[in-house]
């Protein structure tokens, strides 16, 4: 009897351990599904931006996107019970954060996308993690390793492969490339400022406040830049759909998914998945926008992704 009762108890413990093991595996699978979904959304955001720009002017598109996203983020923050008020000492950091991103970053990215392909834009933007250590070294005096240097060289080599044709011709507007690298610079500066406040606030609240403060910069700029064109704009259903997709999916859902994963597996492991964005964007652009991707361009994309892994 005693042996039987012990055997039953051991079986219960064994079953409990097996259940926990499988639950843990399902949770891990769920995390990876979440982060890949976030990367797919951000990859598609370049396609949506291209579609929205057929009707919207760049500044108006960004402002409308931020208004919708801010309302949704506020609702998510309140409903999840994670809403936090800003401490007075952090107000200047949030203003600086919003200046770099979304304000300067979106200006560079959106105007850049009016001049270059979605694929090239995603490849350049994907170099943000590569250049972050360089600025951290210059400003914060953080140590930069040889792997970081090698990653920068590889990534820039890959970008040049995507820009140039096999014949050596250059069919890209230089200003578009400059604007996209300006967006990269803004995002890297944003990451440096983010280190100052990230430990005190939930990620969701940081995204919410940077969107709200970003509107303080965007609304007057949009009125100055786009007001003369308000009466001449003609919106299509596809451009409005693209705006909603950018606002709901790219500015809210993808960030929430990414933040959830970062909390579980950390920033370093999460950022590895951003290497997928230019690959996904290239595939979407080829399938949906009929962008011509030569062998050299695919090699360039692979080189950029390799540089990201090395760094």
Segments and roles (model prediction):
Residues 2-60, 170-196, 217-218:
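Glycine-/small-residue-enriched transmembrane alpha-helix faces in small-molecule transporters
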Residues 27-32, 55-59, 63, 86-92, ...:
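Juxtamembrane helix-entry segments on the extracytoplasmic side of multipass membrane proteins
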Residues 39, 62-64, 106, 120-127, ...:
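Helix-helix packing/entry segments at the starts of transmembrane helices
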Residues 41, 45-46, 74-125, 161, ...:
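Specific transmembrane alpha-helical segments of multi-pass solute transporters/efflux pumps
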Residues 44, 48-51, 55, 69-87, ...:
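Membrane-interface helix-cap regions at the ends of transmembrane helices
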Residues 45, 68-72, 124-138, 153-154, ...:
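Alpha-helical transmembrane segments of compact multi-pass small-molecule transporters, enriched
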Residues 47, 73, 132-134, 138, ...:
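Transmembrane alpha-helical segments that form core, pore/gating elements
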Residues 73, 95, 135, 144-165, ...:
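Hydrophobic transmembrane alpha-helices of multi-pass small-molecule transport proteins
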């Amino acid at each position: 009897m005693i042996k039987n009762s012990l055997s039953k108890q051991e079986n219960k413990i064994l079953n409990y351990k097996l259940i926990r093991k499988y639950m843990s595996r399902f949770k891990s699978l769920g995390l990876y599904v979440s982060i890949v979904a976030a990367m797919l959304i951000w990859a598609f955001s370049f396609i949506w931006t291209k579609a929205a720009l057929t009707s919207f002017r760049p500044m108006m598109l960004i402002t409308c996107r931020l208004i919708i996203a801010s309302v949704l983020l506020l609702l998510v923050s309140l409903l999840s019970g994670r809403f936090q008020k800003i401490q007075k000492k952090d107000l200047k950091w949030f203003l600086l954060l919003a200046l770099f991103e979304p304000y300067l970053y979106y200006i560079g990215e959106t105007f850049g996308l009016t001049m270059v392909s979605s694929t090239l834009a995603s490849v350049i933007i994907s170099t943000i993690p590569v250049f972050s250590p360089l600025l951290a070294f210059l400003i914060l005096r953080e140590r930069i390793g040889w792997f970081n240097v090698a990653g920068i060289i590889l990534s820039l080599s890959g970008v040049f492969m995507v820009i140039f044709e096999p014949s050596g011709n250059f069919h890209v507007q230089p200003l578009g490339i400059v604007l996209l690298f300006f967006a990269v610079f803004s995002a890297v500066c944003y990451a440096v400022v983010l280190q100052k406040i990230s430990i005190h606030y939930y990620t969701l609240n940081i995204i919410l406040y940077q969107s709200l403060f970003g509107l303080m910069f965007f609304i007057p700029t949009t009125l100055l830049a786009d007001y003369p064109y308000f009466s001449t704009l003609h919106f299509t259903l596809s451009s409005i759909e693209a705006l909603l997709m950018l606002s709901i999916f790219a500015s809210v859902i993808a960030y929430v998914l990414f933040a959830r994963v970062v909390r579980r597996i950390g920033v370093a492991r999460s950022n590895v998945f951003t290497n997928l964005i230019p690959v996904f964007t290239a595939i979407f652009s080829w399938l949906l926008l009929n962008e011509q991707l030569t062998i050299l361009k695919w090699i360039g994309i692979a080189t950029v992704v390799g540089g990201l892994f090395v760094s």
